[in-house]
């Protein structure tokens, strides 16, 4: 039971006795709103005007929430587990100490979820696609920051999403209340104290009758002067020459300005319909991403040259998202979604090698890219008794890109790409066994103007999920699915660009889509304050598109091809304890990834161990949070892409709608770096990238919001789409 003021400010919270009785003590006279919630029942709201010091409310009846009880396994007082999702109900303490939806997500410590405030990101450990939603509507992290914790009913954590979510591995859906009048405004600002780093968020929402108007804006400036790299390369040229070069980096400049704007209008004309229109504008201006240093010939100490590698790039991505949902009789739903996106990208890279003022190598790559895309989707759902459901869907993506490459020569590419996806899925239950059977068909089409040959592929994508409830506290789940992966437009371009004095990057228009086979097994157990999640998976991708390098005269050509196969064995174990006395909570995750990469002319294996840990301490109005992530390294083709070693420590104080805090990134190390390697027999490298300012970076945080109006239950959006592929071939080492 939560007692709030009329503007939703938290006053007090209690739990009922076994007989359902409750009392709020020392409550001043005034106007209040009482929020009553219980697992398995719809949340109730009672407006209390002119409350005296002693008030008897009499019997209160809550309506049964069938949506929360059909085919579920109750695993605790704050969580309900289904076959495809968890319904997570934050505690009063967690909501009270959090300033927004991102802070609350950190407090919940859900499996695989990583919050990286350094990069203003919510992601998955080890990568993979994560979808964020608010009442089913596609959202970005800055929109999640705009959510008041008091408005959150629950968070739906889909760790086993169905076919309609595409290739998403996890979906986080914030189910929030929608004011029928009034609205809310707020700001969340973080600023570095010893370097130019910031995350600035402004947001607002206003409701009038059946309409809702909202906006959110994020700006993230970064200006570092301590970025550099150390690199070791070894080249074996076709004429038998072997060269080993060492690059010793010097501190250089890294500047970046990120901008995200969301403007939304939604109309709920009736309880059975919802229309939403969202205009998004994404942008990133990166005028400096510069490296400089000295190149040494390891076999000849007198062979020394100066190196400069500067990149100036920017992109802008406006999009319009139109969504309509109509609920029909007999638990049927129709959903329509159309998204149009324009992506403009500019990039200039200057690479020079010189000695005594004489330029030996001079590479100037300029790229101008324009991409237009349209995504249209329709979904039908039919709900049956006991949680059984049937769904069908059709989506099509059509894109066109025009790219100009200038590097001493002029290249122009015009590419068309189409992707059609049809699926059907049935979810059912037999006693303690929940199952989900699905099948999808995919068509991929690609054509580059000026080329006679077009590419068209079809694939069959089945999926199956078996979820067995072993007890009220544990379950075992097996999943197997097959899906299609298509080449990016940038990789398909036949343009070539010089990388340095020895290397050339070249696309491959003959790339073909390939199949991905995935299976995983999950065991979960929860009892009281203890939670354990064990997970193992195997991935097999024959004919995967991976990198390769070939000799061509006195040059090494970097390109891509359909290789033999790529495989990965993964294992992960998570233990979470808490909240202890609603004050202390901590979690630990450890795991291993074993990669097997088999190319047409190479074969590599690599094993990576990793761990993650989090701890939070909440006492009265103070909260302390600590997080550490060790390297989760990925190996693809012949390239090892290193993860980040991240630590974060922060302490906050919250008073009503105001929260202030101080924190530090990597407070216990002065050697932040990201490692990467390539194991090719003709041109290998080992690179360490450093940003000095990312170690012992101290910051302050300020969050404030205010709201007005009442709340009511709103319709929930079912799908989201977006296009984030620029269609441009990358440059640089």
Positions of PLM-derived features:
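C-terminal beta-barrel architecture of Gram-negative outer-membrane proteins
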Residues: 203, 590-597, 607-654, 658-686
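A short, solvent-exposed loop/turn motif at the edges and junctions
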Residues: 4-9, 31, 35-47
């Amino acid at each position: 039971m939560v007692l709030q003021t009329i503007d939703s400010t938290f006053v007090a919270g209690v739990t009922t006795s076994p007989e359902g009785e409750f009392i709020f003590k020392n409550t001043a006279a005034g106007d209040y709103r009482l929020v009553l919630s219980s697992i398995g029942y719809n949340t109730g709201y009672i407006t209390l005007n002119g409350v005296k010091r002693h008030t008897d409310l009499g019997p209160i009846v809550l309506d049964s929430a069938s949506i929360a009880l059909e085919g579920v396994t109750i695993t605790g007082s704050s969580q309900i587990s289904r076959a495809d999702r968890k319904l997570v109900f934050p505690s009063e303490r967690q909501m009270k100490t959090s300033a927004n939806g991102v802070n609350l997500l950190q407090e919940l410590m859900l499996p695989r979820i990583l919050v990286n405030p350094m990069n203003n990101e919510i992601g998955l450990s080890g990568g993979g696609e994560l979808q964020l939603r608010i009442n089913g509507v596609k959202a970005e992290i800055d929109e999640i920051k705009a959510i008041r914790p008091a408005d959150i009913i629950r968070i739906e954590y889909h760790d086993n999403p169905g076919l309609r979510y595409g290739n998403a591995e996890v979906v986080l859906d914030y189910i929030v209340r929608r004011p029928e009048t009034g609205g809310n405004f707020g700001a969340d600002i973080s600023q570095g104290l010893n370097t130019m780093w910031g995350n600035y968020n402004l947001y607002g929402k206003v409701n009038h009758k059946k309409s809702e108007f909202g906006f959110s804006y994020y700006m993230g400036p970064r200006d570092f002067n301590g970025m550099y790299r150390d690199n070791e390369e070894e080249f074996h040229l076709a004429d038998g020459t072997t060269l080993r070069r060492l690059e010793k980096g010097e501190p250089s400049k890294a500047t970046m300005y990120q901008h995200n704007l969301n403007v939304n209008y939604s109309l709920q004309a009736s309880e059975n319909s919802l229309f939403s229109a969202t205009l998004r504008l994404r942008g990133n201006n990166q005028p400096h991403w510069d490296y400089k240093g000295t190149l040494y010939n390891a076999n000849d100490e007198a062979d020394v040259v100066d190196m400069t590698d500067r990149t100036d790039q920017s992109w802008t991505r406006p999009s319009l998202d139109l969504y309509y949902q109509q609920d029909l009789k007999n638990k049927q739903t129709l959903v329509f979604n159309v998204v149009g996106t324009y992506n403009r990208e500019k990039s200039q890279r200057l690479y020079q090698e010189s000695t005594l003022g004489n330029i030996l190598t001079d590479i100037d790559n300029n790229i101008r890219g324009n991409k237009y895309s349209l995504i249209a989707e329709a979904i039908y759902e039919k709900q049956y008794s006991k949680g059984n459901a049937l769904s069908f869907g059709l989506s099509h993506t059509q894109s066109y890109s025009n790219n100009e490459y200038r590097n001493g020569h002029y290249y122009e590419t015009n590419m068309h790409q189409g992707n059609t996806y049809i699926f059907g899925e049935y979810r059912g239950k037999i006693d303690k066994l929940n199952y989900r059977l699905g099948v999808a068909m995919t068509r991929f089409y690609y054509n580059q103007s000026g080329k006679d040959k077009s590419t068209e592929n079809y694939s069959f994508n089945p999926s199956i999920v078996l979820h067995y409830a072993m007890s009220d506290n544990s379950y075992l789940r097996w999943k197997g699915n097959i899906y299609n992966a298509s080449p990016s437009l940038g990789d398909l371009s036949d343009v070539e660009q010089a990388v340095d004095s020895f290397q050339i990057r070249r696309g491959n228009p003959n790339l073909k889509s390939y199949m991905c086979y995935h299976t995983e097994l999950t065991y979960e157990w929860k009892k009281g304050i203890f939670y354990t999640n064990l997970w193992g998976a195997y991935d097999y991708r024959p004919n995967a598109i991976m990198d390769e390098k070939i000799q061509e005269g006195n040059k090494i050509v970097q390109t891509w091809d359909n290789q033999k196969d790529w495989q990965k064995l993964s294992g992960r174990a998570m233990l979470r304890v808490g909240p202890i006395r609603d004050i202390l909570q901590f979690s630990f995750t450890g795991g291993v990834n074993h990669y097997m990469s088999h190319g047409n002319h190479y074969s590599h294996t690599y094993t990576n161990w990793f761990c993650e840990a989090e701890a939070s301490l909440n006492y009265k109005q103070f909260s302390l949070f600590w997080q550490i992530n060790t390297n989760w390294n990925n190996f693809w083709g012949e390239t090892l892409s290193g993860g980040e070693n991240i630590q974060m420590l922060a302490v906050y104080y919250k008073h009503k709608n105001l929260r202030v805090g101080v924190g530090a990134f990597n407070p216990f190390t002065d050697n932040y770096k990201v490692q990467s390697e390539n194991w090719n027999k003709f041109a290998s490298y080992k690179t360490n990238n450093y940003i000095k300012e990312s170690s012992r970076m101290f910051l302050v945080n300020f969050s404030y919001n205010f709201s007005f109006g009442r709340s009511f239950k709103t319709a929930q959006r079912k799908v989201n789409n977006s296009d984030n592929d620029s269609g441009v071939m990358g440059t640089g080492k």
